[in-house]
Amino acid sequence: MPLPLMMINYSLLLSLALPPIAGGIIGYFTNDLAIKMLFRPYKPLFLGPYQLPFTPGLIPRNQERLAKRVSDTIMGSLLTPEELQRLARKLLQRERVEGALGWLLQLALKQIREDKQQKTAQILANILRDLFSESLPRLLKALARQDNFLSDQINRIFDQILLEFRLSELQSRQFADWLLGTVLPPDTIRLALVDFLSDRNIQVIDEGFREKTSGTYWVVANLFGVRNSLTRLRAFCLEEKETANLRLKELLLSLEIRNRLKDWLQQLSLENLPVSTVRQLRRTTGEVVRTYIRERGEPLLKDFGSSVDWDNVAVLIVNRLQSSTAVTGSLGLVSEELASILERYLEDDLEKIVKQIIPILAIDQVIINRINETPAAELETAVQAIVRSELQAIVNLGGVLGLIIGGLQTGFFLVSRGF
């Protein structure tokens, strides 16, 4: 084949093949080139004192505005208040909340067990000290002003304890021994007898005995009377003290006063009193207790609070709680109840809470700051990675479109040449 004809064929082949090949290459690499043109150069370039146009790249030059637009788009379309409420409800499902609360309670109990400095005991001691020294006295003072304060409690104690109270046999014997040994010993009875047998009382007894007797007793009363006998008894008690005490003691033994007194004390009960008397006693007991609490309740509690070693009490309580199976066994129930309370609260106020949280979290400002703080090179790398991993079909489509456009140009060329 002659050389000129061969050169014409090569030239024609190149003219036909070059447009599709060039179009495919340009279409394939246009995305990378466009992305690079958006970010490059990262910093402004200067020619002498003049800044070159289109430097820095479009995105670095408008990064703050881009950050604001991205933030507005996300907050306006993606993270709307309704979407945040939906996410909050999903996050705060009862099972998750219950599990989180249970974990927190377990963690708190573990922290208490590992507390070497007894911080928990110190806090509890301060609470107990304030409760019994300040808070309860003030509360008691305020409540004691009510007329029905502790009315039900006092009546219940009176009916269940005081009304049914009886001395046991041992208590009755000890009480009788105390009465006859301390309150009414023979010497005390002798002195009481001497005081009773005064001249006037003896005269009254003698006259009454004379006037109110009849028959044989009248004869004895008017012939002999009782004046001389009572006078001699008084003189005997005054002059023969030890002998009189001994005779009185023998008389008490012979009359079995101790046993009689013990039996009487053992049978003594408020239930044997009339109903009206019991009601009055109940009313009087309540008034006495309330009056005492009004007048002495506050200082009594303060004295009690200041006299107790609350530090030691708090340590004992904390140590007991650490080893208590009731505490560890009730953590699940406590977390369940707390989750139920939180669920009821969130049903009514979740929308209000989300509206209050959004300004506090300032998500839009976080997005703006994060974009502004990210270097342009990192943004470019991230965009390139997304394009290569998720948008590779667009890159391939660019190459195919370039190839098709190049083929169309070749077709127009052939048509224009008359092939």
From Swiss-Prot:
Family: Belongs to the UPF0754 family.
Major subcellular location class: membrane
Name of this chain's protein: UPF0754 thylakoid membrane protein sll0412
PANTHER family named in the record: UPF0754 MEMBRANE PROTEIN YHEB (PTHR35791:SF1)
Membrane topology, as annotated: Single-pass membrane protein
Compartments where found: Cellular thylakoid membrane
Transmembrane segments: 394-414
Keyword NAD: no
Keywords per UniProt: Membrane, Signal, Thylakoid, Transmembrane, Transmembrane helix
GO cellular component: plasma membrane-derived thylakoid membrane
Range of residues in the leader sequence: 1-22
Organism: Synechocystis sp. (strain ATCC 27184 / PCC 6803 / Kazusa)
Lineage: superkingdom: Bacteria
